[in-house]
UniProtKB/Swiss-Prot annotation:
It comes from Shewanella amazonensis (strain ATCC BAA-1098 / SB2B). The keyword Lipid metabolism applies. Keywords: Fatty acid metabolism, Isomerase, Lipid degradation, Lipid metabolism, Lyase, Multifunctional enzyme, NAD, Oxidoreductase. HAMAP family: FadB. One of its GO terms (cellular component) is fatty acid beta-oxidation multienzyme complex. The active site is at H449 (for 3-hydroxyacyl-coa dehydrogenase activity). The record marks E118, E138 as: Important for catalytic activity. Substrate binds at D295, N499, Y659. Residues 1-188 are annotated as: Enoyl-CoA hydratase/isomerase. This is Fatty acid oxidation complex subunit alpha.
Amino acid sequence: MIYQSPTIQVELTADKIARLCFNAPGSVNKFDRETLASLNAALDVLKDSDAKAAVLTSGKDTFIVGADITEFLALFAEEDAKLMEWIAQANVVFNKLEDLPFPTVSAIKGFALGGGCEAILATDFRVADTSAKIGLPETKLGLIPGFGGTVRLPRLIGADNALEWITTGKDQRPEDALKVGAIDAVVAPENLEAAAIQMLNDALAGKLDWQARRARKQAPLTLPKLEAMMSFTTAKGMVYAVAGKHYPAPMAAVSVVEQAAGMSRAEALVVEHNAFIKLAKTDVATALIGIFLNDQLVKGKAKKASKLAKDIKHAAVLGAGIMGGGIAYQSASKGTPIVMKDINQAALDLGVNEAAKLLSAQVARGRSTPDKMAKVLNNITPALDYAPLKDVNVVVEAVVENPKVKAMVLADVENVVADDAIIASNTSTISIDLLAKSLKNPARFCGMHFFNPVHKMPLVEVIRGKDTSEETVASVVAYASKMGKTPIVVNDCPGFFVNRVLFPYFAGFNGLLADGGDFAAIDKVMEKQFGWPMGPAYLLDVVGLDTGHHAQAVMADGFPDRMGKSDKDAIDVMYEAGRLGQKNGKGFYQYSIDKRGKPKKDVDPASYTMLAEAFGAQKAFEADEIIARTMIPMIIETVRCLEEGIVASPAEADMGLVYGLGFPPFRGGVFRYLDTMGVANFVALADKYAHLGGLYQVTDAMRELASNNGSYYPKA
């Protein structure tokens, strides 16, 4: 051993090949400050040793997952000069790796992402095993690569390929990385290190020109001027079409690669550093890094819960159709066999067909095979009676959203399943404590609220009733995680968390329409300016105005002081006219099927006529007022949920909003949005609209936080 630290060990073989092994104490390797300092010291030792070549490897199942993102928010709060010092020093280390006086190779297994990918780019050769995933995901955090990724990758695989990698932030499979020249070989895991050392021996024997490889990475890009101009112009258009104005990092990446194309390594790195620092200081980066950290927190809680959980080996869903079929597909495709029970054969057929349709789409996209599809379908057992449920560990009730029907079904199933089987209800609004009254043992009962479409929406709300045991909660959280979902635990109340905060937003929208607002103009502002994937009118059409009408009544009963209403609103107008939204072709908008078989929406003059009859002449509203009147009620209700303990933390609330409702990720969720705006500024804005009713009244705790210049997340 010629060098040893807690994170890196370097040993020299008899053939004078140095083996630099990343092996941090935790479960993964990452480039935190300690590891960067260790790498710097290790490279100094290597340079002065009698090594003839070096292989970079990992003592973990994965190579390096990237920089330590937990350090980012505090680091990015530093002054620009401090941030420049950190990034410049990191690049001194990576340059030192690239400049070693002998050939180098990376032996890559598992993830080599972000800084991990930039480390392998600094070596002369790269060998990956079949488990490898390589990529530069920094744009997903509102950043660009900062350890030389925008400099080395374009010179290695060409500007077009590099920009696709960097601007999408996608992980690359080893075979795809090999095709474009990002790596030099793909081998079986058991042959990885031997193949890497063979490559070094070939370089030492003159069969591979490691110096030419290195020189190419450090030289300007070789692109004719006209071709370069066309290439970067095209890239900007394509990237902006996807990223839009709210996500500046992908466009910044294109500009950096373009600006640095004709520069040396040293000059190009300065361009990268400056752009990185500028992005690191944006609210978008803070929001996206916050989402990443919140996601880790939620998943960490789920992992902890799994230690208390029952082992779910076999599941059941009651109620087939689209929702039941989606739950069955999700469970079976992630390895948990499931019984799908319904009283109606046609509903069972619909559920199985829904699962088959989703699996066929996976096969068509090359993400699955016919054999895997058959295996998943074999894991779904349709049933018209309860007999196959006697051995299941968990039952998810997903029948019609009617408390009497649900109570009857829950009582029936409790008499069939094992005494220790868990029973969960997929309800969006009905009180878990109310439903629990139909059970003899409410301790094994909780809510498990999936979002539609099940296969696309990542969130599951796990709702704890007053009698629900911790083992039940932990087991359902573990099952949701096993299904590939992100579970958040919330306490029981009308609407639980997500729907409770959604309907005040709809109330704000209804208020605007009652005052003469144009629903299409409101949608445009909320989509294009605020950043929602759908505006409120379009969202109501997709959810279904019958569903919205029912849920709104539940919320009004639950919170009459704030959500009760005496006058007819726009949802009532549409519902009473039989306009149910996308499901029957007319809601606020009218719908037809386009050439690709997808629903196409158009403004319907009949909607405007009905709304004018109900509320009078149309009136134009400024974008700021539209945003304020829709968002203030949602924000205050979200804060109330935290204060009442419905949701445990700002992080979990924000993840619920982003994953359950599509809250704009670049804003980070309600609590990140509040901190960015300043709680005092929000309180002042809400007070301006306080005359609109209880939904616009901030809480006393919010006022106190505002007066103390406080925040919901710790200040960096």
